[in-house]
Amino acid sequence: MENKWFLLMVRDDFKGGKITLEKALKLLEKLDIQCNTIHVKYIFKDNDRLKQGRITIEEFRTIYRIITYREEIIEIFNTYSENRKILLEKNLVEFLMREQYTLDFNKSIASEIIQKYEPIEEVKQAHQMSFEGFRRYMDSSECLLFDNKCDHVYQDMTHPLTDYFISSSHNTYLISDQLWGPSDLWGYISALVKGCRCLEIDCWDGSQNEPVVYHGYTFTSKLLFKTVIQAINKYAFLASEYPVVLSLENHCSPSQQEVMADSLLATFGDALLSYTLDNFSDRLPSPEALKFKILVRNKKIGTLHETLERKGSDMHGKVEEFEEEEEIEQEEDGSGAKEPEPVGDFQDDLAKEEQLKRVVGIPLFRKKKIKISMALSDLVIYTKVEKFKSFHHSHLYQQFNESNSIGESQARKLTKLAAREFILHTRRFITRVYPKALRADSSNFNPQEFWNVGCQMVALNFQTPGVPMDLQNGKFLDNGCSGYVLKPRFLRDKKTKFNPHKVQIDSNPLTLTIRLISGIQLPPSYQNKADTLVIVEIFGVPNDQMKQQSRVIKKNAFNPRWNETFTFVIQVPELALIRFVAENQGLIAGNEFLGQYTLPVLCMNRGYRRVPLFSKMGESLEPASLFIYVWYIR
């Protein structure tokens, strides 16, 4: 039956005799078979018996079966098929319920799957499924590891902004290093397309009264400020309808700050949030209330109430000066000092606060005078930048619309030594963590340690591939790639006792079991003979950081079989990410990266699942993937 269908599908292509590799590739595409051209080239060569660069219809059928008839899928099919030829509708129902854990299952779902994936018409009409149909279903998006529930906005978006992790970039204008690299609009466009919701704009005085964007005091190229925000306006809401925050690093004179203010108003129009929303004059609004809005994050003169009193007044030509304590950057001491007992709640005496300052190494400050155009200042509503001094100071004096920027070195020390106080701080105030200045190569830190304490804006260099950006992309797959992910309740509760370094004994851990079955057309290495292995990593609170590795399958990147089982006990699954990495074992220069996939642990489907692989730059490597079986219980 399947042979008859196959011959019917391809015979016209062989009317002229044998076909070339190019025609074979087109025919595979016609049959809806995704394949890696390099793999097909080697398979074609092996099956071209006369070595003439042309194959017969029988040779093509052999190639087709090598690519599509995977042994592990045949084994599953035969387990549920009564005659090893056809799945009855009831057989498919049994498979879906027992193996795929389709909890909201009804019989019509099985019927819909047959109608959608069964290519042989007479089989479809009989409400049955051939192996061809079953294989197509198993290779479809319905059998991906990522739960499609998480593929759309499903979380409550009416909480205040402080209750969300927000996808954030650092030095968004750069597409290379921070000393010589070019500034490019593509930095902003690509970040927005990926769902980034907080962009950084370094603004400096330019010629002809036109502010420019670049990395100051370096050889990086320059962009016009107005050109940057025009690009942002075009792409801001293509990937997500939720608010975009423009974090300004403002080094401009008051006159050019006015130019910036005028450009912002002219470019964004009503989308620019220049006044408080109704009912949100004393608390932060939600992403839902701020849909399709642009927020300016910058220093600000005076209070929000004073801004509202000036509503409608022309602020052009008006400049205010204030004195700010500028941080004198210090190196991390790297002493690895023993973690002291964390300080108590904010009502504890100031002696403990001073003790924490000495242990953590709160940076030194010096006075600095800053001039700000009132026209620009008044565009800052809910995201005023306020210098961070201490948790105690913020508790006493910081206002709801004031946010902090903390360098990674200081933030890391605070995370290790005062995690609970950090969580209580991020519960009330938006906190942005950014890479230290020494990262001239635009490298990134591990964002997980700052998500663990509730930091909303963990800003990374989006242009730099690697594990940190894999975690970033995986984290924000959740909630429909909207750029906003609701923080777990224990990071939002004002009475929280959560400490990522001291997970309570009565936590509710998740036991995760993954059976790594096989690889599917992994990116081929030298001569298509990669020695393939897979690493499965968990990122989360310190106790959840772990990884396991498969054995090496020699000289096989096309269809390696492992059949190995890994088990993880995850204490805080709400914060955990899982990363799958395929590598080619290297004996001298280290392992060669082949592909990876990262996603939140709680966004995984159970059952037989396909893990799509992505390149270092985050590009899809389809059809390269892993085939696994997932089970977890809590």
Swiss-Prot record:
Q: Which residues form the PI-PLC X-box domain?
A: 155-299
| Source organism (scientific name) | Bos taurus
Entry's InterPro entries?
C2_dom, C2_domain_sf, EF-hand-dom_pair, EF_hand_dom, PI-PLC_fam, PLC-like_Pdiesterase_TIM-brl, PLC_EF-hand-like, PLipase_C_PInositol-sp_X_dom
User: What protein does this entry describe?
Assistant: 1-phosphatidylinositol 4,5-bisphosphate phosphodiesterase zeta-1
CC terms in the record's Gene Ontology section:
nucleus; perinuclear region of cytoplasm
Domains as described in the record: The EF-hand and C2 domains are essential for triggering Ca(2+) oscillating activity and the regulation of PLCZ1 enzyme activity.
Question: Start and end of every EF-hand domain?
Answer: 35-70
Self-association or partners: how does it assemble?
Interacts (via its C2 domain) with PtdIns(3)P and, to a lesser extent, PtdIns(5)P in vitro.
Reactions accelerated catalytically: a 1,2-diacyl-sn-glycero-3-phospho-(1D-myo-inositol-4,5-bisphosphate) + H2O = 1D-myo-inositol 1,4,5-trisphosphate + a 1,2-diacyl-sn-glycerol + H(+)
Location within or outside the cell: Nucleus; Cytoplasm, Perinuclear region
Q: What does this protein do?
A: The production of the second messenger molecules diacylglycerol (DAG) and inositol 1,4,5-trisphosphate (IP3) is mediated by activated phosphatidylinositol-specific phospholipase C enzymes. In vitro, hydrolyzes PtdIns(4,5)P2 in a Ca(2+)-dependent manner. Triggers intracellular Ca(2+) oscillations in oocytes solely during M phase and is involved in inducing oocyte activation and initiating embryonic development up to the blastocyst stage.
Region annotation (Disordered) ranges? 312-345
Q: What is its EC number?
A: 3.1.4.11
Q: State where composition is biased (Acidic residues).
A: 321-334
Q: Where is the active site?
A: H170, H215
Keyword annotations of the record = Calcium, Cytoplasm, Developmental protein, Fertilization, Hydrolase, Lipid degradation, Lipid metabolism, Nucleus, Transducer
GO MF terms listed in the record are: calcium ion binding; phosphatidylinositol-4,5-bisphosphate phospholipase C activity
Instruction: Spell out the CDD domains in the cross-references.
Output: C2_PLC_like (cd00275)
List, in alphabetical order, the GO biological process terms annotated in this UniProt record.
egg activation; intracellular signal transduction; lipid catabolic process; positive regulation of cytosolic calcium ion concentration involved in egg activation
